[in-house]
């Protein structure tokens, strides 16, 4: 399974101060998500953000009669999400720290690197939130899986204070919105995430919407420098 080189979009305002690494969903590509950079960079607060859009390797998809598609992990069934391709997931997860360290080498601190993804890409995003050993800037999870119980052995508390924006549609035909609510409960109650916002969109399917993008932008702007401690009051 050969991989396509990630698409990299430079910050409009240099030097770059922030970085976003965005993972696509099944059958998509990094190119399919470059619109997000264009949208976010329009805002002056994110003009100094640079973006990385990786593309998953092509692999046979079991649930699709082994037809090949770009995927971060195999899909074994469209009807059940309990059987997870851990081997494929863990292999794809190896890419995440490499991309993060590339940004650090370019002068972007961990605390200003955001990870995001859609569907399978959301699984990588939340897997990173649970396992990465350094505090990151934040996480964007769009239409992700209904459970991360299979990741419990990898849990780190380094990012429990990082901001998480999780979105889901009530008409999602792949992952029901009830699963999103369960994920939110587990991240806040079981794993101790303190700034985890779940936004459910009425009538939205396994997709994103203009309102969702506006909400994500507002959340990002409100949390861009969340790693900075509040200033002490003057004595």
UniProtKB/Swiss-Prot annotation:
Family the UniProt entry places it in: Belongs to the AB hydrolase superfamily. AB hydrolase 2 family.
Active site per the UniProt annotation: 119, 172, 206
Source organism of this protein record: Eremothecium gossypii (strain ATCC 10895 / CBS 109.51 / FGSC 9923 / NRRL Y-1056)
EC numbers, comma separated: 3.1.2.-, 3.1.2.22
Catalytically driven reaction(s): S-hexadecanoyl-L-cysteinyl-[protein] + H2O = L-cysteinyl-[protein] + hexadecanoate + H(+)
Any one Gene Ontology molecular-function term assigned to this protein's record: carboxylic ester hydrolase activity
Single Gene Ontology BP annotation: fatty acid metabolic process
Entry keyword set: Cytoplasm, Fatty acid metabolism, Hydrolase, Lipid metabolism, Nucleus, Serine esterase
This protein's name: Acyl-protein thioesterase 1
The keyword Zinc-finger belongs to this UniProt entry's keyword annotation: no
PANTHER family registered for this protein in UniProt: LYSOPHOSPHOLIPASE-LIKE PROTEIN 1, LYSOPHOSPHOLIPASE-RELATED
């Amino acid at each position: 399974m050969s991989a396509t080189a990630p698409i990299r979009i430079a910050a409009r305002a240099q030097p770059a101060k922030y970085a976003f690494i965005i993972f696509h969903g099944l059958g998509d590509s990094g190119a399919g998500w470059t619109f997000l950079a264009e949208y976010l960079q329009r805002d002056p607060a994110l003009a100094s953000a640079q973006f990385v859009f990786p593309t998953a390797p092509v692999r046979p998809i079991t649930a699709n009669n082994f037809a090949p598609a770009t995927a971060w992990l195999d899909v074994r069934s469209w009807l059940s999400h309990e059987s997870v391709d851990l081997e494929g997931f863990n292999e794809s997860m190896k890419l995440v720290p490499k991309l993060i360290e590339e940004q650090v080498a370019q002068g972007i601190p961990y605390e200003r690197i955001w990870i995001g993804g859609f569907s399978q890409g959301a699984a990588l995003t939340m897997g990173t939130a649970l396992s990465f050993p350094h505090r990151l800037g934040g996480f964007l999870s769009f239409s992700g899986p209904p459970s991360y119980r299979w990741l419990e052995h990898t849990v780190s508390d380094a990012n429990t204070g990082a901001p998480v924006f999780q979105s889901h549609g009530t008409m999602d035909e792949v992952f029901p919105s009830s699963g999103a609510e369960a994920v939110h409960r587990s991240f806040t109650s079981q794993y101790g995430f303190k700034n985890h916002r779940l936004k459910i969109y009425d009538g939205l399917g396994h997709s994103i919407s203009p309102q969702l993008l506006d909400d994500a932008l507002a959340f990002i702007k409100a949390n861009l420098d969340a790693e900075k401690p509040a200033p002490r009051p003057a004595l």
